[in-house]
Amino acid sequence: MSESGGMVKSVHVIPLKRVYFGRRMNRADRAIRLVRKYVARHFKDAEKIILDPELNKYIWSCGREKPPRRVVVEIRFNKNEKEARVFLKRVK
């Protein structure tokens, strides 16, 4: 975790395998909710959680029924505004 001013940056690997236990028709929807829930659990002070559109596209890339099993994200938490922004981390 790196900290500068009121901003905290951290990289997390979020496992999404739990969404495969339920019905097939709404797995991507549940994956988005699971990401929000994960961020809320790890950043308890966050009043607002904003997901990047690229992350949303990545989760929906294989359709509604087959989201990825895990996703690597960078979370930027602004302590002053109590806002967490979630970005897709590009792994090269």
Swiss-Prot record:
A Pfam match: Ribosomal_L31e
InterPro entries: Ribosomal_eL31, Ribosomal_eL31_dom_sf
Keywords: Ribonucleoprotein, Ribosomal protein
Family: Belongs to the eukaryotic ribosomal protein eL31 family.
Gene Ontology biological-process entries: translation
GO terms assigned for molecular function: structural constituent of ribosome
CDD domains (UniProt xref): Ribosomal_L31e
GO cellular component, one term: ribosome
Protein name as it appears in the record: Large ribosomal subunit protein eL31
Keyword hit for Cytoplasm: no
Cross-referenced NCBIfam families: PRK01192.1-1 (NF002258)
Lineage: Archaea, Thermoproteota, Thermoprotei, Desulfurococcales, Desulfurococcaceae
